Swiss-Prot record:
Mg(2+) 1 binds at residues 19, 153. NCBIfam families: ruvC. It is found in: Cytoplasm. Its main location: cytoplasm. Binds 2 Mg(2+) ion per subunit. Keywords: Cytoplasm, DNA damage, DNA recombination, DNA repair, DNA-binding, Endonuclease, Hydrolase, Magnesium, Metal-binding, Nuclease. This is Crossover junction endodeoxyribonuclease RuvC. Its cofactor is Mg(2+).
């Protein structure tokens, strides 16, 4: 897999979304900022063969995520929050892949955020119960793509990055309003006032 090298525009925030998995770990990098449209930087999947021993599969995920981080230089990493599933082996591998993504963020001093699947679905489609096809459709629509990224793990990673950009941006604006109020200044009455 070839990951395009790119230099982020400092007026926008670049987020690397990670849909963790042991067999397929989706990765999507999106950038956007206040008043600018979202832009897909790169999308793909890190694959590990099932016949490889577990430790070496995790090492491949680590090396792949490091390569993605090196090439795309994100400002933050958003990871899907892992929930217990019926298959304990699946959830263990998924949680380990998520931990690797968080460790890489920490190693490079990047903020890391965990988003639940319902949060991501609600942010991207308006419904926390959207299915994978609906999420993929909305990812393509928001980014003006001719088709959703494939496979679904890649589309989910892009949706995570979009969710973080949208939700993280709102959180930063709220923090700015609170900080302004603490300094004794007038609190903006609308989000547009915060952009000034």
């Amino acid at each position: 897999m070839s990951i395009p090298k790119s230099t982020p525009d400092r007026r926008v925030t670049r987020v690397m979304g990670v849909d963790p998995g042991l067999t397929r770990c989706g990765v999507g990098v999106v950038e956007g900022g206040l008043g600018s449209s979202l832009k897909l930087i790169a999308v793909g999947v890190i694959r590990t063969p099932a016949d490889l021993d577990h430790a070496h599969r995790l090492l491949r995920i680590h090396d792949g995520l490091e390569e993605w981080r090196d090439h795309t230089r994100p400002d933050a990493i958003a990871v899907e929050k892992v929930f217990a599933q019926h298959n304990r082996n699946t959830v263990a591998g998924t949680a380990q892949a998520a931990g690797i993504a968080m460790m890489i963020a920490a190693r490079h001093g990047l903020p890391v955020a965990l988003h639940t699947p319902s949060e991501v679905k609600a942010a991207i489609s308006g419904s926390g119960r959207a299915d994978k096809a609906q999420v993929g459709f909305m990812v393509a629509r928001v980014l003006r793509l001719s088709a959703p990224p494939k496979p679904a793990d890649a589309a989910d990673a892009v949706a995570l990055a979009i969710c973080h950009l949208w939700r993280g941006g709102a959180a930063r604006r709220i923090e700015a309003a609170v900080a302004t109020q603490r300094r004794g200044r007038r609190v903006p009455r609308s989000w547009k006032d915060l952009a000034r």
